[in-house]
């Protein structure tokens, strides 16, 4: 996306849903917290989180070297890690993991969710994800073919079931930022017991 100079457009298009996800996740927090952006792209969410007074640590992880390099160019003080999400294990577990438009790139999203639950999230930690690529969103059905990248097409129910099966608690889901042309970003969240 960076090579094609499309990361800025992704940031602009995803900002409303990400802000909705963050508002939901941060509103109950009253103490300092730690954060990971899983699939951080150019690092815009990490930069935003580093400006939040209660955020003690914000880390961005991405498997694309161009994205990590751009994130580091834009934010020389931020923590950005080049790694496949399935291989990454933070030195210290965190309170909040956010992922926007990433999980469907994995052939087994439940495996990624379980890896994050086991290795990234501390007790009472929250995972919140947003996906625009799901069965009920008819406008996305040609994305995999158009982009030339495999994507895992799941229904809203399938996504929620992955969270339930993982053993996460307090699972919630909703469609964020719908409009006349778009059914909305599917947001799913849950916490570690």
Feature map (PLM): residue ranges:
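Short, glycine-/aromatic-enriched active-site segment of Class I SAM-dependent methyltransferases
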Residues: 131-150
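Conserved beta-strand signature within the Rossmann-like core of class I S-adenosyl-L-methionine
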Residues: 124-132
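A short glycine-rich, Lys/Arg-flanked "PGG" loop and its adjoining helix->strand segment in the class I
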Residues: 110-123
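Class I SAM-dependent methyltransferase SAM/SAH-binding core
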Residues: 36-38, 42-87
